[in-house]
Amino acid sequence: MVDDNGSSPEVEGAEGAGAPLLALLRVDGLNQTQTRSPSPSFFGSYNISEDVYFYFNGLPTSTELVLNATTSATSATLSPAMVATGGGGTTTPEPDLSEFLEALPNDRVGLLAFLFLFSFATVFGNSLVILAVIRERYLHTATNYFITSLAVADCLVGLVVMPFSALYEVLENTWFFGTDWCDIWRSLDVLFSTASILNLCVISLDRYWAITDPFSYPMRMTVKRAAGLIAAVWICSSAISFPAIVWWRAARDGEMPAYKCTFTEHLGYLVFSSTISFYLPLLVMVFTYCRIYRAAVIQTRSLKIGTKQVLMASGELQLTLRIHRGGTTRDQQNQVSGGGGGGGGGGGGGGSLSHSHSHSHHHHHNHGGGTTTSTPEEPDDEPLSALHNNGLARHRHMGKNFSLSRKLAKFAKEKKAAKTLGIVMGVFIICWLPFFVVNLLSGFCIECIEHEEIVSAIVTWLGWINSCMNPVIYACWSRDFRRAFVRLLCMCCPRKIRRKYQPTMRSKSQRFATRRCYSTCSLHGIQHVRHNSCEQTYI
């Protein structure tokens, strides 16, 4: 029954009781055969379909229920997000988010749960990185400070940006949190994503400086300089995000559509932000990693060549050789054998090096004849026992050897770090390149993108996958971070489990013991301290 004003008494009673819009629609949709004429106070002049509301509440859609509005028949299916203000001045109750979530179909609920789980994994993994660098002193390096800044940006993406985007996508681009928070959320999305990309760019520059100029790098990359670079990253990211939102709100024509969270599609801003946020950092990263790869190949080749030259001349182990003093291999060999009874041979290789250890250790190398005999009790002691005839020469030579081993170990760690960060860069390109291609294409030719909303959602979440992948890459490729992660994860475990994993971690006392081992070998020349074991402990 409809009164003179065109409104239903049941509806008025429900509205007076403060029932939500979905309940009103449920009351009106009970009689499927009755043709209704809802008043303008319901939907007014809005060309709005009730399909999604009926779908969410298990009611017949417009294909089964004919709705004849007083102004015009509803023909298009729009988003359920709306504020229906009628010509009579009556405002319908605003849709409630909780009711929408309760009425979601199972497939949408599963998608929402998956996206929330993905957001949690991003926050959890990056929080591990942050806590690891804070707790473990051996991770207090300039590179790891940059990685911490990257983890902070990625963690905030998972904490602030992803959950609201998940709701927005699952509810078919419906925004329930107001216009102000929409603008803030969009600006934070730009801020954190740009900061993540720029941090990767700074990390690539840091690795480039460390590998191409390793001697001056420790003096150049101080804590203050690292803090300055991190501050520059966040200031630049803020300059791209927040002022643009202020400009966007001032230049926007009219009010933002109700229950929508749109962002500027101005071509100038899209080109500017994409260039600063992605394309320039991408060029810098590609350039630096190409140079890093070339430098690593050259240094690795030179180390191998230098080691082989000394191996052919003296027959010693690799870590006791190759000293950069400007001299030749013959000079280095004479330094080792010059003070004892061995008698260093000339360049023709006819000489021999022999000695007798106090514990019946003996070995003989005949370079000319090509024969080698060895009768040691402990073969691993040969590199040290071969030098015991001349204490001063042994002391100098071992000091050089240990210095070389430290350089080799440091270079190996630098090269592995560069490889790890190269993988990070590759994942970064795969994740973010589609988004910025679509971002620019939407400014030039939005019609060229079929199913634009679906494509935008896919490439956006693909970019956010990068924030979740970085901690996984650190755990898989960085032994230091892997140790720190195990420590953190075992803190809540029983003491037996913590003790089980404790020997696999290099503690502070173990690092000091390693240094004492090198000091003892260098100063006192103890014959039974194995060179190889010292090196393995150090590395």
Curated annotation (Swiss-Prot):
Question: What SMART domains is this protein classified in?
Answer: 7TM_GPCR_Srsx (SM01381)
Cell compartments where the protein resides: Cell membrane
Q: Supply one GO CC term from the record.
A: synaptic vesicle membrane
| The UniProt record lists the keyword Transmembrane | yes
Membrane disposition: Multi-pass membrane protein
* Compositional bias annotation for Basic residues: 356-367
Task: List the S-palmitoyl cysteine lipid attachment residues.
Answer: C492, C493
Q: Where is the composition biased (Gly residues)?
A: 337-352
Region spans: Disordered? 326-387
Identify the Gene3D superfamilies for this entry: Rhodopsin 7-helix transmembrane proteins
Q: Which domain of life is it from?
A: Eukaryota
Instruction: List the glycosylation sites.
Output: N5, N31, N47, N68
Membrane spanning segments where? 114-134, 146-166, 190-206, 228-248, 267-287, 421-441, 454-474
MF terms from GO for this chain are: adrenergic receptor activity; dopamine neurotransmitter receptor activity; dopamine neurotransmitter receptor activity, coupled via Gs; G protein-coupled amine receptor activity; G protein-coupled receptor activity; tyramine receptor activity
Q: Name one Pfam family in it.
A: 7tm_1
Which cystines does this chain contain? C182-C261
Which tissues is it found in, per the record? Expressed in both central and peripheral nervous systems.
Asked whether the UniProt record includes Cell membrane among its keywords, one would answer yes
Q: Which UniProt keywords apply?
A: Cell membrane, Disulfide bond, G-protein coupled receptor, Glycoprotein, Lipoprotein, Membrane, Palmitate, Phosphoprotein, Receptor, Transducer, Transmembrane, Transmembrane helix
Q: Which PANTHER family match?
A: ADRENERGIC RECEPTOR-RELATED G-PROTEIN COUPLED RECEPTOR (PTHR24248), DOPAMINE RECEPTOR 2 (PTHR24248:SF185)
The job of this chain, per UniProt, is described as: Receptor for dopamine. The activity of this receptor is mediated by G proteins which activate adenylyl cyclase. Also capable of generating a calcium signal. In terms of antagonist responses, would be classed with the D1-like dopamine receptor group. This receptor is an attractive candidate for initiating biochemical cascades underlying olfactory learning.
Name of protein: Dopamine receptor 2
Q: Which gene encodes it?
A: Dop1R2
